[in-house]
């Protein structure tokens, strides 16, 4: 049986393809939009059986081309640029496309795992998979929220096959280089340090000290493991937060990135205070454009994920960033 991965050349999608390969699974249809041609690099070291453009795939799927051949669709393909304000494009790409795949999977009794987002919570301070805590602030978040609402209703009515949505928090790790400004802070810090010998962070604002704004940073390694756990457990459906379950300040990311780079340079680790004193960590004024629109704190409540049976420990920023820097240096030299 064949597994479909949409967004397969993207960040999380390509890591999922690699994770499936590591299990010996290569009968994979990779679906994506390679208008950004550089994304193909993410699949060069992966094994797939076929590639299709996302529009061609949906057309063939609904025409019955793959009837009886698919075991699962891992749907990671979407417009993830939170600054894209084209509502029609966002809803067509993120909501309608997801709905079409979901309906097909229910009809054909195929497992369906898809990417939701922590953007569904908006400026909330409680990050728990419950309606009262949700309030997206942009059309990207709304497109994800709306399909989550559809799934909730369909679960009440009764599903014919597994359907799982993952609310990804701040994911970082290998194969994100094509994302440009939307890539993780760890990726940008790595490049800043390698090019300039220092990294830049937002200074304090709204009661937060320099670099102390915090996020739930989750390694893509853990994201892949959780996806595969649910693939192995087709009886579990629902919407789940996928973060580390801990909030860590941007200072931690800077410190971890710099020290991982220094390790490769044969230099001793430094404390954050030493980095600041030596000018390696530099704080810039908090941008006026972000004031009032910026989340200074996120932390996934992963109790529901644990209740579903996923018991593995999540990587800390220090652990995950260290491994990520090893990978980046291995690729870039």
Swiss-Prot record:
Substrate binds at residues 170, 181, 188, 202-205, 215, 294. GO terms for biological process: ADP-L-glycero-beta-D-manno-heptose biosynthetic process; lipopolysaccharide core region biosynthetic process. The active site is at 140 (proton acceptor), 179 (proton acceptor). GO terms for molecular function: ADP-glyceromanno-heptose 6-epimerase activity; NADP binding. Keywords: Carbohydrate metabolism, Isomerase, NADP. Binds 1 NADP(+) per subunit. Its EC number is 5.1.3.20. Disulfide bonds: none annotated. It catalyses: ADP-D-glycero-beta-D-manno-heptose = ADP-L-glycero-beta-D-manno-heptose. Catalyzes the interconversion between ADP-D-glycero-beta-D-manno-heptose and ADP-L-glycero-beta-D-manno-heptose via an epimerization at carbon 6 of the heptose. PANTHER family: ADP-L-GLYCERO-D-MANNO-HEPTOSE-6-EPIMERASE, NUCLEOSIDE-DIPHOSPHATE-SUGAR EPIMERASE. This is ADP-L-glycero-D-manno-heptose-6-epimerase. It comes from Chromobacterium violaceum (strain ATCC 12472 / DSM 30191 / JCM 1249 / CCUG 213 / NBRC 12614 / NCIMB 9131 / NCTC 9757 / MK).
